[in-house]
């Protein structure tokens, strides 16, 4: 099951949280959900070059708070904050509510699955060889601390007559383990031969604070490290 389902959806409530964080009665739920979809679609379309990973929407009472996670916050803010103020006004018009806008910088875009997928899609649109783009992304992610990464590219790769799927993996990506921190992202490359789809899984390690066995495992690891250090002192 872990191989088929979206890894983020599988881990909601375990070690991931929702990107839309609000509650509404049944009469308002549909309207607010479509409003969220319009906000995300508008932000991603207007700020295609800003390397946006995700858009988090929160709704306090009669207000709206939008948080954009981006690897290039300067492109969103603009000169003296002019662009971000223009974006805030547009989002206020879309929601008919007082809207605040926050920008969160992504420090390591090389291990963010969505940004990796967007980067590969842009390279394919510039006619870079898909194997080179995939291998470069894998090497960058592993160099910057990812424990594993898998990339799938599908479509008419390299202009082939028959569509196919190619994948590249390095390290380990445990999709069935719920405590594993697996990031997932997708993108589409609009090439001259058709649309190519890119899927990226990045394994960043295990999140143990939600695991009931975590304290016992940490104690065991501490005992093992302590005994090994004692042995080193005795040998010295």
Swiss-Prot record:
Lineage: Bacteria, Pseudomonadati, Pseudomonadota, Alphaproteobacteria, Hyphomicrobiales
Role description: Binds the lower part of the 30S subunit head. Binds mRNA in the 70S ribosome, positioning it for translation.
Organism: Bartonella tribocorum (strain CIP 105476 / IBS 506)
Keyword field: Ribonucleoprotein, Ribosomal protein, RNA-binding, rRNA-binding
Name listed for the protein in its UniProt record: Small ribosomal subunit protein uS3
Quaternary state and interactors: Part of the 30S ribosomal subunit. Forms a tight complex with proteins S10 and S14.
GO biological process: translation
Protein family membership: Belongs to the universal ribosomal protein uS3 family.
Stretches the record annotates as Disordered: 214-236
Keyword ATP-binding recorded: no
Gene that encodes it: rpsC
């Amino acid at each position: 099951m872990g191989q088929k389902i979206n890894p983020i959806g599988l881990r909601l409530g375990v070690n991931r949280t929702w990107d839309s964080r609000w509650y509404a009665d049944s009469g308002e739920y549909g309207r607010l959900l479509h409003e969220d979809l319009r906000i995300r679609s508008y932000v991603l379309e207007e700020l295609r070059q800003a390397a946006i990973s995700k858009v988090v929407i929160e709704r306090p009472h009669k207000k709206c708070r939008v948080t954009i996670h981006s690897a290039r916050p300067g492109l969103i803010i603009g000169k003296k904050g002019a662009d971000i103020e223009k974006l805030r006004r547009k989002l206020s018009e879309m929601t008919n509510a007082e809207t605040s806008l926050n920008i969160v910088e992504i420090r390591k875009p090389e291990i963010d699955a969505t940004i990796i997928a967007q980067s590969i899609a842009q390279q394919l649109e510039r006619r870079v060889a898909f194997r080179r783009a995939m291998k470069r992304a894998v090497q960058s992610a592993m160099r910057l601390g990812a424990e594993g990464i898998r990339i799938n590219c599908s479509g008419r790769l390299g202009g082939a007559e028959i569509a196919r799927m190619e994948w590249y993996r390095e390290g380990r990506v445990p999709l069935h383990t719920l405590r594993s921190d697996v990031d997932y992202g997708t993108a589409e490359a609009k090439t001259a031969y058709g649309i190519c789809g890119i899927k990226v899984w990045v394994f960043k390690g295990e999140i143990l604070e939600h695991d009931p066995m975590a304290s016992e495992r940490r104690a065991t690891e501490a005992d093992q490290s302590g005994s090994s250090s004692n042995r080193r002192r005795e040998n010295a």
